[in-house]
Amino acid sequence: MSLLLKNIVLPLAHFTLAVDVEVRSRVTAIFGPSGAGKTSLLDLVAGLRRAPSAFIQLDDRVLTDTATGRLVPTCARGIGYVPQDLALFPHLSVRQNLLYGCKSGAAINPLFAFDHVISVLEIAPLITRSVTALSGGEKQRVALARALLASPQLLLLDEPLASLDEPLKAKIIPYLARIRDEFRIPMLCVTHDRLEALTLADEVVVIAGGKVMQAGPTLEVFNRPANPEVAKFVGMETLQPGCITEVHDGLATVSINQTRLTALAPELAATEVFVCIRGEDVMLQREAATASSVRNRLPARIKALRPQGALVRVELDAGFPLFALITRPGCAELALREGDAITALIKTPAIHLVPR
């Protein structure tokens, strides 16, 4: 799939959405914080909003071109859309909601046949029920099925997991993956959920304040953020200004206050950098670290322990604020307490340097 979004200019309440990007992957995540303009961009692709300037092309079909006045109606775009509120009809049964989305005609792709769709999403037992009697996860699957029954060329998903609790999210993600693999339909998925983006998307477009901050393969964006804003969005718990004092054999020595770290040298020549470290890449050790391949071994003191579900966020003073994410059993085995001295270990490739 090729989706070209060019010369997009849409004034919003607090900023102007301004986008120029082309996506070619099967599943692309529009990723970023709430209120960044992600849903507005999705609405433009669906034809639900008009912009003073926009050129939108899906493969070889121009859907919107404000320069020529072309605007293909929403119903003729060949797009399935699952909005965040799902937009199911509460006065209709599940079957009636599904039939509302069915595409008629002899040229329907067998992949999108009614029986096949409800089988893949496992909603046959729900067919006769009222949508008001469904759980959040069941409603999500019905909304996905209705969008697929329109036999779309592109599927738009707006925060498909946002309204679900963690157990339900874990149940819905496999269905989204099944849609990706079974129907092989291009998907554009708006999300601010890291797990959702990492699990489903081939490419990520990071948007903040109405602008594209970075776009590219998912792992590349998550592992090599282009700037501090992207680093925060993709989950770099530690983000500190530093200075490169030496580069040798592809390794950079970085100084943060009086603390020295070894990292992979950035491709761009820069001395002033932001040091980005994920919490899960920081290991903790009670005794002083013995000889190992880990280059960064920092004496630190525990400032706070903050439980986060199955994990504990450990706030450290290592000469600079450093954050570690460890499991609850790991925290218990180390008998961690506030004020304790600890050694933090960070492998060289886990320290990402972003020019500032």
Where do the language-model regions lie?
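ABC nucleotide-binding domain signature
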Residues: 29, 71-73, 77-87, 188
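Walker A (P-loop) phosphate-binding loop of ABC-type ATPase nucleotide-binding domains
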Residues: 33-37
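ABC ATPase nucleotide-binding domain helices that frame the ATP-binding cleft
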Residues: 39-42, 142
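Helix-to-loop junction immediately C-terminal to a conserved catalytic motif
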Residues: 46
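Glycine/charge-rich catalytic "coupling/switch" loops of P-loop NTPases
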Residues: 50, 258-309, 323-356
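Conserved ABC transporter NBD signature motif
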Residues: 54-66
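ABC ATPase NBD coupling module
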Residues: 63-80, 104, 221, 225
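ABC ATPase nucleotide-binding domains
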Residues: 84, 93-229
